[in-house]
Amino acid sequence: MPTAAPADMDTFDPSAPVPTSVSNPAADVLLAPKGPRSPLRPQDDSDCYYSESDNETPSEFLRRVGRRQAARRRRRRCLMGVAISAAALVICSLSALIGGIIARHV
């Protein structure tokens, strides 16, 4: 497998594209474009900007950002509620199972 020559820091160009090759599938996986957004993955704020050239007032922008943050908090609280409920269900089920095993042997 060919290896890349070490880069000399005097000639290193940080803006140069990162090469990928078929011989290194791990790099291809790491550099592959991300798929559709998962509801569990936090959303990025790539479209969260304010420009006076847009047809949006500062108060509308702040309201939009506030609604987005409130929705994130609401989703996070719902996810935590589901996780806590699932954990409680698992603990109760294990407790019942262990109780049944102990009762059978007594």
Curated annotation (Swiss-Prot):
InterPro entries: Herpes_US9
UniProt KW keywords: Host cell membrane, Host endoplasmic reticulum, Host Golgi apparatus, Host membrane, Membrane, Phosphoprotein, Signal-anchor, Transmembrane, Transmembrane helix, Viral envelope protein, Virion
Region (Disordered): 1-61
Pfam families: Herpes_US9
Positions of region (Acidic): 44-56
Residue list for modification Phosphoserine: S51, S53
Intravirion side: 1-81
Gene Ontology terms describing biological process: intracellular transport of virus
Segments on the Virion surface face: 103-106
Membrane topology: Single-pass type II membrane protein
Compartments it resides in: Virion membrane; Host Golgi apparatus membrane; Host smooth endoplasmic reticulum membrane; Host cell membrane
Disulphide-bonded residues: none
Record's comment on post-translational modification: Phosphorylated on serines within the acidic cluster. Phosphorylation determines whether endocytosed viral US9 traffics to the trans-Golgi network or recycles to the cell membrane.
Motif Di-leucine internalization motif: where in chain: 29-30
Residue spans crossing the bilayer: 82-102
One of the record's GO cellular component terms: membrane
Family: Belongs to the alphaherpesvirinae envelope protein US9 family.
Functional description taken from the UniProt entry: Essential for the anterograde spread of the infection throughout the host nervous system. Together with the gE/gI heterodimer, US9 is involved in the sorting and transport of viral structural components toward axon tips.
Protein name, UniProt field: Envelope protein US9 homolog
Organism of derivation: Suid herpesvirus 1 (strain Rice)
